[in-house]
């Protein structure tokens, strides 16, 4: 930035970092600076649309998305980037919808297919999620995220599944025998407590996976092992 303060990729990275830290006003300020340099930068408009969605400003989000698609109406990058940012804010259903739109624009857009696979797995739509992960891996066997996910999928096949009280609890056979029933009882108690506290009902089975190693949890959550700190 000291060499070229108008470098858009560097500015956009700063905007993303500020958004990740929930410094939305600062992120918006950086985006305004970008639009003064390049008012048609699609990826920046995608981030702008995502930030408006996070702040519950649907009309502004729609307008920002339209600006990102102004000169390429079917650019899959725009919806992919919007959805990716929304998913990073735990808005997985909204993020998945944008990935589906990106794939409608370009059915072979692997970034969207990989992200959609992860979103669906987080939403409990496992059959489609694992299928998309396999499709993405077949298209790019060197992609780290899908390789890690499918390796974990093979491990999960060896787990014991306890299906009771609206929960699907997956854990290793040894741990399931040791405290599986107690875990289901605790989950049931927690659901009743928080359903009453927040006056809501959880629809569909809740999938809970207990991993013996932290790296497996990291792969399931982030697509890559790690997570120290």
Residue ranges and their predicted role:
Residues 2, 64, 70, 158-229:
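Juxtacatalytic substrate-recognition/specificity segment
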Residues 20-33, 54-67, 89-101, 123-132:
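Structural signature of tandem alpha-helical TPR/SEL1-like repeats
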Residues 5, 39, 73, 107, ...:
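Short coil turns that delineate tetratricopeptide repeat
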């Amino acid at each position: 930035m000291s060499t070229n303060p108008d470098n858009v990729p560097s500015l956009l990275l700063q905007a993303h970092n500020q958004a990740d830290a929930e410094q939305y006003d600062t992120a918006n300020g950086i985006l305004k600076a970008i639009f003064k340099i390049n008012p048609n930068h699609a990826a920046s408009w995608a981030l702008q649309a995502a930030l408006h969605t996070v702040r519950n400003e649907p009309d502004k989000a729609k307008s920002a998305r339209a600006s990102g698609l102004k000169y390429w109406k079917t650019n899959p990058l725009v919806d992919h980037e919007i959805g990716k940012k929304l998913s990073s804010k735990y808005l997985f259903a909204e993020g998945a919808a944008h990935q589906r739109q990106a794939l409608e624009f370009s059915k072979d857009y692997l970034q969207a297919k990989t992200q959609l696979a992860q979103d669906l797995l987080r939403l409990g739509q496992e059959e489609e999620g694992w299928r998309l992960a396999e499709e993405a891996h077949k298209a790019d066997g060197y992609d780290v995220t899908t390789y890690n996910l499918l390796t974990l999928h093979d491990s999960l096949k060896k787990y014991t599944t306890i299906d009771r009280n609206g929960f699907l609890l997956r854990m290793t056979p040894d741990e399931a025998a040791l405290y599986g029933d107690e875990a289901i009882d605790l989950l049931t108690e927690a659901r009743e407590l928080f359903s009453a506290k927040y006056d809501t009902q959880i629809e569909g089975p809740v999938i809970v996976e207990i991993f013996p190693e932290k790296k497996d949890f990291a792969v399931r959550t982030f697509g890559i092992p790690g997570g120290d700190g």
